[in-house]
């Protein structure tokens, strides 16, 4: 990609932002930077928190550039989870987050649309009744099985870790397949992740609080994107 193409891509990705969305991004990143200064958090934690925050805000906007920041987040978050011995989180990064960045990019690339302002955003879909039934049954079965596997492996916080890992898998799959219901799972996941990291890591705690706010907005915005497709 030459300089002009890169410049055009960045300009395209930054177009169509509402004032609230800009404030949301500034607030989320600012919270991470403030925490870094106050607590002298490890640099890797800070990089993970900041890139992860930028990534999810871009996802809520339906911007394909989220995958660049998601890739950086995945690499750094793996080592943060490794330090805390969260086996489930490590596996979710290694087998879900990392592959999803590459798969998701190409699936999204083939399914983009332009809004009235000419800004390019992803084409969003919604689950039907059958899709919901498959999702709920799969979540229940795989969560129970994975919790038992974590206990056998000697992981920390196995029940909570197991729930968050399987929920992450499902939400990530819905994300790369462009379903708006991913955001309902992200809301649940972010609440659970706040509990998981509450005592262990302030940087991760702040990151997931920012994620929770963004996921609520993400569901709202993707509902609008999905209605645009129906229209």
Model segments located where?
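Membrane-helix interface "capping/anchor" motifs
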Residues: 57-69, 173-185
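C-terminal transmembrane-bundle signature of multipass membrane proteins
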Residues: 175-231
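Short, Lys/Arg-rich, polar N-terminal cytosolic tail immediately upstream
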Residues: 1-15
């Amino acid at each position: 990609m030459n300089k002009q193409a890169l410049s055009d891509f960045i300009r395209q990705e930054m177009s169509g932002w509402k004032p609230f969305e800009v404030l949301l991004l500034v607030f989320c990143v600012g919270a991470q930077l403030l925490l870094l200064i106050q607590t002298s958090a490890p640099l890797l934690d800070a990089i993970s928190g900041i890139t992860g925050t930028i990534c999810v805000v871009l996802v809520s906007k339906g911007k394909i550039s989220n995958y660049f920041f998601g890739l950086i987040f995945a690499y750094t978050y793996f080592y943060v989870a490794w330090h805390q011995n969260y086996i489930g989180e490590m596996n979710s990064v290694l087998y879900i987050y990392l592959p999803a960045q590459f798969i998701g990019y190409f699936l999204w690339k083939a399914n983009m649309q332009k809004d009235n302002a000419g800004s390019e955003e992803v084409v969003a879909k919604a689950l039907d009744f059958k899709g919901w039934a498959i999702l709920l049954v799969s979540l229940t079965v795989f969560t129970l099985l994975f919790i038992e596997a974590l206990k056998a492996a000697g992981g920390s916080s196995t029940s909570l870790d197991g729930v968050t890992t399987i929920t992450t898998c499902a939400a990530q799959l819905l994300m790369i397949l462009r379903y708006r219901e991913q955001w309902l799972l992200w809301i649940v996941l972010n609440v659970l992740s706040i509990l998981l990291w509450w005592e262990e890591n302030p940087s991760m705690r702040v990151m997931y609080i920012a994620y929770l706010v963004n996921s609520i907005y993400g569901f709202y915005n993707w509902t609008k994107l999905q209605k645009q497709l129906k229209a």
